[in-house]
Amino acid sequence: MFKQILGKLPKKTSAKFWDNGESQTLDNNNNQGGGDEVLSQRTSSNGDTSLDCVSSFDVLPRLRDVSISEKQELFLKKLRLCCLVFDFVAEPQQNFKEKEIKRQTLLEVVDYVISSGNGKFPESVIQEATKMISANLFSNPHRQWKNKTPEALDLEEEEGSLNPSWPHLQIVYEFLLRIVASPNTDPKISKKYIDHTFVLKLLDLFDSEDPREREYLKTILHRIYGRFMVHRPFIRKTMNNILYDFIFETGKHSGIAEFLEVLGSIINGFALPLKEEHKLFLTRVLIPLHKLKCLPNYHQQLSYCVIQFVEKDCKLADTVIRGMLKYWPVTNSAKEIMFLNELEEILEATQLTEFERCMVPLSRQIAQCLSSSHFQVAERALYLWNNDHVTNLVRQNSRIILPIVFPALEKNGSSHWNQAVKNLTENVLKVLSDTNPDLFEECLHKFQEDQQKAEDTKKKNGETWRQLEEIVASMAK
């Protein structure tokens, strides 16, 4: 990724920097970098690094052009320079040269982190690095762009807006990723600066509409969770709170899929037996996430998290299946197919004992899916019988399950409008007939009796209505 960023750089930049619209030309005689100079900002006494507070600039050499003893101090100066934040939203056409100089400086500090030796970064480096990262990632100018989206725009139908500050932000994210992942970063020192406040602000950025930004954040959060064990409970708790707010309050958040992808890795690392707090997370967060209408945006990641729980503790299968039945979509066929896909994967990890606890309500729901006029829903439900494990669970409980699903299958075979559904239904009926012929005949006989009773009742009701109509007609005369 870093090589791709480097490849986009122009070979040379101008040595002119603008300060509030007034140009300052550098004296090339003072250039210590052989034409590749970088500018150092002088800030106000209160440390403000906004563009309005910059008064003058000094020429800085390249890191590769100074001695080893000077590199660290020069690196710190470059980090301070990179704290200067440009407004790409309000002033997109201004300060081109300055923006490019900062971009090159950012690339240089990233390269310094990558190529640094085996020595640990001192506290001063970590402190200045987190200051620079905070100034760029958490600054208002970089966040104003997301409010530019018209209110009438349906965000669920859009791929997301792209952050205009990305030429700088991308490299800052790369720098943060390299710092966090570097073996030269000591977590014991870094946790003082990459603290709860820093992590909380980082998690808030997941609501960015830019998918490139969310992808970086996902990778960085993975690294922070892996290296900073002291922050793990806080990260899980904060993610829970964000998901609670999404489920029960707002219903809108751009980074749910990325959150769940990180959580999938976290769940995968849970030790057995599962803690009660982890089981509560399943029942209070993951299962209710199925009810939102934007489920397609994150269903793949959600399904993975849920299945991880069932694979770790098969006793949770009953809880998960009943939870899914509670939120089963009624009028959304696309979501119904997603539920059936997830259900099959859950059943794959379900043992017989847990299956028997929920098989009656589950069979009723599957029967409704079999009866669906939407052919894809009916097809997906029929495909469950292609799964050997599911078929085995059904076979061992055929006395209870077959009477529930048989009417739907028989009606499909005779009256469904879609020929593919009819063909699949015939195959399933043949499998059920071969598995338990006697029970199959019983179900068929009962179905025919019920059909005859329904027909007789219909005729009787029709005759009753006819007599009532005659009585009313005679009274009218």
From Swiss-Prot:
Top-rank taxon, per record: Eukaryota
Induction field: Induced by epibrassinolide.
UniProt-listed Pfam families: B56
GO cellular component, one term: nucleolus
Tissue-specific expression: Expressed ubiquitously.
Any GO BP annotation: signal transduction
Locations listed in the record: Cytoplasm
Record keywords: Cytoplasm
Assembly information from the UniProt record: PP2A consists of a common heteromeric enzyme, composed of a catalytic subunit (subunits C), a constant regulatory subunit (subunit A), and a variety of regulatory subunits such as subunits B (the R2/B/PR55/B55, R3/B''/PR72/PR130/PR59 and R5/B'/B56 families). Interacts with SRK2E/OST1.
Function: The B regulatory subunit may modulate substrate selectivity and catalytic activity, and may also direct the localization of the catalytic enzyme to a particular subcellular compartment.
Family classification: Belongs to the phosphatase 2A regulatory subunit B56 family.
Protein name: Serine/threonine protein phosphatase 2A 55 kDa regulatory subunit B' delta isoform
Native species: Arabidopsis thaliana
